[in-house]
């Protein structure tokens, strides 16, 4: 399954196919299946947007409900390969739009970050990782336009503030 881009795509596509077959076998059309990936690696050799685009073009042909993109910065531009200099999500959304929902997580901390992401139109859904962990009422604060109350940095000196308990010491952002 290694070597060419096409051969390397065999494994993830077979996993998706297997999940879809199990959903069908169990007669569970309501069971949501998606695929999560990080679109580009900073080192060489590493995954480029050219390879990611090929995989996404195949994934949108599958009976999945979403593709979830994980990166450090929602607006990160493509480093190398196809789409260089263009926001990765813009490149990806041009492929997924109208075929499968795109979910993105990546460095959104402030209310203005979330608003900018929503207004970009680069994805159908926005996920919150760190922001959600350090603001247990994130959704309510954003909905009620109380972005000034958002914590944007983790306070390892006060783990009791978070519902992660002692595990907070293992988080590095």
Predicted feature residues:
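Flavin-dependent oxidoreductase catalytic cores
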Residues: 1-173
């Amino acid at each position: 399954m290694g070597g060419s881009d096409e051969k390397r795509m065999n494994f993830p596509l077979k996993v998706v196919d297997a999940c879809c077959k199990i959903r069908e076998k169990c007669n569970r059309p309501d069971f949501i299946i998606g695929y999560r990936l990080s679109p580009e690696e900073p080192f060489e050799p590493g995954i480029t947007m050219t390879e990611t685009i090929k995989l996404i073009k195949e994934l949108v042909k599958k009976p999945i409900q979403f593709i979830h993109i994980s990166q450090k910065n929602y607006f990160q531009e493509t480093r190398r390969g196809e789409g260089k200099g263009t926001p990765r999500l813009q490149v990806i959304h041009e492929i997924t739009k109208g075929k499968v929902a795109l979910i993105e997580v990546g460095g959104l901390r402030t209310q203005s970050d979330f608003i900018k992401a929503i207004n970009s139109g680069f994805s159908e859904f926005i996920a919150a990782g760190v922001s959600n962990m350090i603001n247990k009422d994130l959704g309510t604060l954003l909905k009620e336009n109380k972005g000034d109350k958002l914590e944007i940095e983790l306070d390892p000196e006060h783990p009791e503030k978070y519902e992660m308990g002692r595990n907070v010491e293992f988080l590095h952002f």
